[in-house]
C-alpha cells in the first residue's frame, strides 16, 4: 500500500486500537511512502546510534535523550521546531518504536498536527537470541539507509 491517504486511514485505525494520543502508527514501508509524499522523517535516536548503527538519508535528527547519560533532551521541542514546520506531517523513528512513541506524543501536545510513530523502528524487535535487525524494522525491510 503506497497511497498516502490509505496509509493515513490505516495509521489512524491503529491509533484508535492502540489508544495512541497522536495521528497514528505506521510500518517502516508505510513511513517511507509517506516520506515520498512529503512527510518529514525525524530520527530521535542518540548521536552514537546514528553514527554507529546507520542513518536514513534525508532525515532530520533530533535526539530524544543523550548518550551515555540517557538524559532527556531539554531542547527537544525547540530543535524539532527548527527542523520541521508544525503543518508538515512527521514520522518519528528510533531503534524499536519506544522513544519515537513518546516523541510523537510530545510533539502532538506541542501543536504538530500530524505525527506518526514508526512501528518496529530502525533495528526492529529482538529475536529469540535477543538480537535486533533479524525480525523486522527499517533496515530489514530493505529501505534506504547508510552507515555512519
Protein language model features and the residues they cover:
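Structural scaffold elements adjacent to functional motifs in cytosolic proteins
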Residues: 41-43
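Rhodanese-like catalytic fold shared by cysteine-dependent sulfurtransferases
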Residues: 1-37, 47-89, 100-148
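Short, surface-exposed ligand- or partner-binding patches at beta-edge/loop junctions that are enriched
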Residues: 92-93
Amino acid at each position: 500500500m503506497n497511497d498516502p491517504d490509505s496509509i493515513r486511514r490505516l495509521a489512524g485505525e491503529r491509533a484508535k486500537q492502540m489508544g495512541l494520543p497522536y495521528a497514528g502508527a505506521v510500518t517502516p514501508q508505510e513511513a517511507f511512502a509517506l516520506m515520498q509524499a512529503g512527510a518529514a522523517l525525524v530520527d530521535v535516536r542518540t548521536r552514537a546510534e546514528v553514527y554507529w548503527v546507520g542513518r536514513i538519508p534525508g532525515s532530520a535528527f533530533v535526539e530524544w535523550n543523550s548518550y551515555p547519560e540517557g538524559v532527556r533532551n531539554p531542547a527537544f521541542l525547540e530543535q524539532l521546531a527548527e527542523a520541521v514546520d508544525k503543518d508538515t506531517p512527521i514520522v518519528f523513528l528510533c531503534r524499536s518504536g519506544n522513544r519515537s512513541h513518546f516523541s510523537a506524543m510530545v510533539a502532538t501536545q506541542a501543536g504538530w498536527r500530524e505525527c506518526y510513530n514508526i512501528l518496529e523502528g530502525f533495528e526492529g524487535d529482538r529475536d529469540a537470541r535477543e538480537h535486533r535487525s533479524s525480525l523486522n524494522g527499517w533496515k530489514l525491510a530493505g529501505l534506504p539507509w547508510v552507515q555512519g
